[in-house]
């Protein structure tokens, strides 16, 4: 049925996102969670997600939602996190998206320092 096929497609897309995200770990990214339509990821940069989101849109044409839109103000994860929507792109575009994120070259922060603040 259409519903069953659509469900399978959605689940496969989420699985593909998680699998293709793995190489980003070496570049300092981490996958906080991945659902059927969105993923929450920690980025490796010194600047917060609110500052970086418009820069990434300008430089790479990638629209990311800053984590500060989804976390309480006092939560330190908000500035370190992006929400990525992948519901309307196919597996090839997911792969391209993640390769482009991996190659971003903004100033990176020291993850050890961040882990101590948590």
Language-model features and meaning:
Residues 10, 17, 39, 56-57, ...:
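Generic structural signal for small/hydrophobic residues in well-ordered secondary structure
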Residues 20-25:
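A structural motif corresponding to the C-terminal end of an alpha-helix
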Residues 41-45, 86-88:
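Short beta-strand-to-loop capping motifs
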Residues 7-18, 29-43:
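Conserved glycine-rich beta-strand-loop-beta hairpin in the small C-terminal domain of fold type I
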Residues 49-50:
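Structural motif corresponding to alpha-helix initiation and N-cap regions
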Residues 58-64, 73-118:
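PLP-dependent enzyme catalytic core of the Aspartate aminotransferase-like
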Residues 1-11, 15-19, 99, 105, ...:
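Conserved core segment of the aminotransferase class I/II
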Residues 27-28, 68-73:
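Short, solvent-exposed loop/turn elements at beta->coil junctions and helix N-caps
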């Amino acid at each position: 049925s259409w519903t069953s096929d659509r469900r399978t497609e959605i689940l496969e897309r989420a699985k593909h996102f998680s699998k293709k995200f793995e190489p980003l770990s070496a570049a300092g990214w981490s996958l906080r969670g991945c659902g059927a339509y969105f993923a929450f990821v920690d980025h490796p940069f010194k600047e917060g997600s609110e500052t970086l989101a418009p820069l990434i849109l300008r430089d790479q044409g990638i629209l990311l939602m800053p984590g500060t839109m989804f976390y309480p103000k006092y939560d330190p994860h908000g500035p370190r996190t992006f929400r990525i929507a992948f519901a309307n792109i196919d597996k090839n575009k997911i792969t391209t998206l993640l390769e482009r994120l991996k190659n971003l070259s903004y100033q990176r922060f020291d993850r050890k320092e961040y882990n101590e603040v948590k």
